[in-house]
Amino acid sequence: MAEELSKGYQPGDVETQWYSRWIDAGCFRGDEKGEKPAYSIVIPPPNVTGILHLGHVLNNTIQDVLARRARMEGKDVLWLPGTDHAGIATQSKVEQKLRKEEGKTRRDVGREAFLDKVWEWKEEHGGIIIQQLKRLGCSCDWERERFTMDADYSRWISKVFVDLFNEGLIYRGKRMVNWCPKSLTALSDEEVIMKPQKSKLYTMRYRVAGTKNQWVEIATTRPETLMGDTAVAVNPKDKRYADLVGKMVIRPFPEAEIPVVADDHIDPEFGTGVLKVTPAHDKNDFAIGQKNNLEIIDVFHPDGTLNAFAGPDFEGMDRFEARVKAAEKLEAMGQLVKVEDYENSVGYSERADVPIEPRISMQWFLKYPCVEEAAAAVANDEIHFRPDRWKKTFAHWMEGIQDWCISRQLWWGHQIPVWYRKANAADLQARESLDATSAGDDIYVGIDPPGDADQWVRDEDVLDTWFSSWLWPFATMYKSDEESSPTLKKFYPTTDLVTGPDIIFFWVARMIMAGFRWQGEVPFKNVFFTSIIRDKKGRKMSKQLGNSPDPLDLMAEFGADALRFGLMRIAPTGTDVKFDDDQIVEGRNFANKLWNAARYRQMQEGAVEARPVDFAS
């Protein structure tokens, strides 16, 4: 007689036992040699530093539903898992650990020793989120788990860089980037968090050159950068200042004559309608400077302190201290008109939690390949966006696409595969522009180091994390030196992608371009954009607000199925949802009803004896 089901449903025990049986029976293996129709999906690789949050739960539950449905439909299913090395996120964690335990910085221990520590940390902590995904019940083919720093995957990264460099699409140059003065690296837009902030709006005045008492009032939130001003600007349609355009005004300190220019970017309604132009420290100002051939004066060191160009009164001072000092100096000169409270949004480094600086820096850039093909694939529904309203967002970004800053001043990541001949390395690295045409014999770009490696020095920068993840759908399926593989032939292009709309540019668009460039076709056929989960008050969940429940606690209390059921019930694709524990309680109650129904049937006279399922049959 079959063992009687317990009176109360214990989801933890039942779910764990079933998952182990599925794994032991090989239920999740993708069979590239099978004759059934293929279904494939690649997991958006979570950060190796990560732990499960509700966004992960929703995203991976949707993927699991799609994969399990495909198996029920008789398809060979490959759900390919893996993790991302998460450059700055992982490096930051190890740097914090190093400071706490040894009182040292990464530069104190050196690059090689520091990277050894990162790998040690990764081996110790890197599998946590994978184990959590298994507890959630994800039916991935775990035997195929990949990591973006795997040796084979890393060779793919180098190959792609070499291909694009040789095609003239990768170059090095001086451009304005998001700069973190704490981590001392360029950041992607995705790594910058906009935060509302209570600031001050300073109205100051510059004297018109050649006059004794004609002044121009200028509004700014950043008086600490005025030492880098090389113009002031007005809107060409602003009649108040039409007679000023083309004249010169006098910058207070260091004293210099600078021109008044006209630019459509200037908002006549902001402040006085006149803005200072500091090309080295503002993206819009940089563009104005390029149009008007203005001098670029960088007044900051990389760490956010002021340099010699700021003058002796400010050199070495922190940027925020310099803001106060500059206002005081203007007031002493009689050129500070007023100071008002002002609320604005300021970009913060997501990891370092400090305000970023727009900064002109020597970086590596990529001109995107296959832009037209990618745009057409979405516009013509070769790739279906669900919901399709995201097509407009995608098209708008593709129309205004700009070159991608792919270099980062970090140590953890894929080091750029460029070597400089030692004898000329300093001159080569100081060049303001470098590409395949101008490289010459003193620069080597390759997958492997040059044969006489001791005569060369490697570029110290690493590649943006997204430069590895944009290859994820195909680089996980075969090696870079292979023409193809049975896995690629069977399962590529993948069927579906499930991701958040916040990375439609950073990941989705780039994967489509990479798919066309290296595989000649789209990387997936459908993209499902998930909801953003908010709390009951509609606020985004965060550790700071304390409104983000731990999914592991919820699974321990209610069961994984209850959590999955509750989230799926409230999460229509692409629409923000408000989370409440009551939804998970509903999931638990539903599971209890199913259990009690099975138990009731078991107790009836003449009930069929329950037997273990034979997965092999």
Named regions from a protein language model:
Residues N47-P81, Q96-L98, C180-K182, E191-A209, ...:
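Conserved active-site neighborhood of enzyme catalytic/cofactor-binding cores
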Residues G103-D116, N307-G316, K540, N547-L552, ...:
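Short beta-alpha connecting loops at secondary-structure transitions
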Residues D243-G246, I250, P312-R323, A332:
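A glycine-biased structural micro-motif
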Residues M1-K237, V261, T278-K291, E295-A310, ...:
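N-terminal, positively charged nucleic-acid-binding surface of large information/translation enzymes
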Residues I258-D264:
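Short beta-strand-centered aromatic/proline hotspots
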Residues Y202-Y206, K247-F253:
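Short conserved beta-strand and strand-loop elements enriched in small hydrophobics
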Residues M1-Q10, A376-R389, G606, A610-V613:
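Short, contiguous pre-domain boundary segments
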Residues H301-P302, Y368-D388, L488-K490:
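Residues forming anionic-ligand binding surfaces in small-molecule and nucleic-acid pockets
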